[in-house]
Amino acid sequence: MDIEAGLDFLKKDKNMKVLINKYGRPDFNQGQDYFQSLLRSIVFQQLSGKAAKTIYERLVSLIPKTSNLCPNEVLKLNKDEMRKAGLSFQKINYVRNLADYFENNSLQKKDVEEMTDEEISKELIQIKGIGQWTVDMFLMFTLNRADILPYKDLGIQKGIMKIFKMKNLPSKNEMENCSKKWRPFRTIACWYLWRITDDKLSK
């Protein structure tokens, strides 16, 4: 994803230009491990950031220091230990489903880079515990795909509602229409939508 090109493009929109000038350059990490990224997303589902971070760190600490956080090591973990780390029974199953998938399927970087967003979504959603929101976060922050708009993300909904001065949260169609001017860099635009939603002082 060419962030500089995206910023130059988005600055043509007056609302985005204001946000870019206020919040600066967005931060997108690169080269994250696919399995670890999705594992972290599952742990973080429906939890506050602080609580999820603690549980994730406890889960990682269960892996022997001489080993890597990989599918095979996760499958070796005792369910009772995972429960004591703070994972619900449902999430334990989701984590094991994910590990089992990666243990038996070769999701190689070179293959993923050639797949479309839709193909990746179709592939990952078959894993129980992975929904569209998790796929969108994976596409945005692990693969750095440039034009992702997570329709189900409340922060993005609130950001669009705030920018376009809507009285209610936008529908999927409204979000699509409002974001057309940001294509093909909606991933970067979303970074700013999250910022304006988090900024309690923003008007």
Residue ranges and their predicted role:
Residues 37-42, 58, 77-81, 119-123, ...:
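A general alpha-helix detector
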Residues 28-36, 86-89, 179-186:
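Structural motif
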